[in-house]
Amino acid sequence: MTLTIGLTGGIASGKSTVSAMMRELGLPVIDADEAARAVVRPGEDAYRQIVAAFGPGILQTNGEIDRAKLGAIVFNNEEERKKLNAIVHPAVRQKMLAEKEALVRSGTKTVVLDIPLLFESGLTSWVDKVLVVYVDDDIQLRRLMERNGFTEEEARARICAQWPLAEKMKRADAVINNNGTREETRRQLLAILKQWDALEK
């Protein structure tokens, strides 16, 4: 029986760090952001639908979708954003589920689904255990400003667009506190995975 772990957190909470640690431990990680990039590549169904919906003006000279141009169209326009999400979200879900099913069929002991918006997208039914990566608000804000070059106002707006981390923690099966060092984070991760019997013997 395969154990499916849903890995999530807040923006700049250190989820990617934990995801990388899980890969290092030999766990297969299916990443929602990677899937979202894959489904909009030239030749994919979602790519064709996006070009049909938004016109060839969103393409770069090499035929790939210009994410900045598309982003500018959908960022401040709720209707356009809904139109894009209605194309991309089902394609991403289909891709992730297909990858998960293939791993389950091959008898993999544990599969990790790395989904930033696990709760917001209502996908908790996909997983057996939810692992939330947490940091204090001030650290989250500082990391986001440093990492993305955001002003404090921009960083706060990005954080507020997601569920509060405190709410995610309440619904989690386990929480990793990522305020400290990488080693402290790794220790917590190992303890949780051992408790869940998630690692190959």
UniProtKB/Swiss-Prot annotation:
Reactions catalysed according to its record: 3'-dephospho-CoA + ATP = ADP + CoA + H(+)
Pfam families reported in the protein's UniProt record: CoaE (PF01121)
Listed GO MF terms: ATP binding; dephospho-CoA kinase activity
InterPro entries: Depp_CoAkinase, P-loop_NTPase
Any one annotated GO CC term: cytoplasm
Associated pathway: Cofactor biosynthesis; coenzyme A biosynthesis; CoA from (R)-pantothenate: step 5/5
Span of domain DPCK: 4-201
One biological process term in Gene Ontology: coenzyme A biosynthetic process
Entry annotated with the keyword Transmembrane helix: no
Statement: the UniProt record of this protein carries the keyword Nucleotide-binding: yes
Alphabetically ordered keywords of this record: ATP-binding, Coenzyme A biosynthesis, Cytoplasm, Kinase, Nucleotide-binding, Transferase
Broadest EC class assigned to this enzyme: transferase
EC number: 2.7.1.24
Binding site for ATP: A12, S13, G14, K15, S16, T17
Subcellular location field: Cytoplasm
Biological role: Catalyzes the phosphorylation of the 3'-hydroxyl group of dephosphocoenzyme A to form coenzyme A.
Protein family: Belongs to the CoaE family.
Protein name: Dephospho-CoA kinase
Organism of origin: Geobacillus kaustophilus (strain HTA426)
Gene name linked to the record: coaE
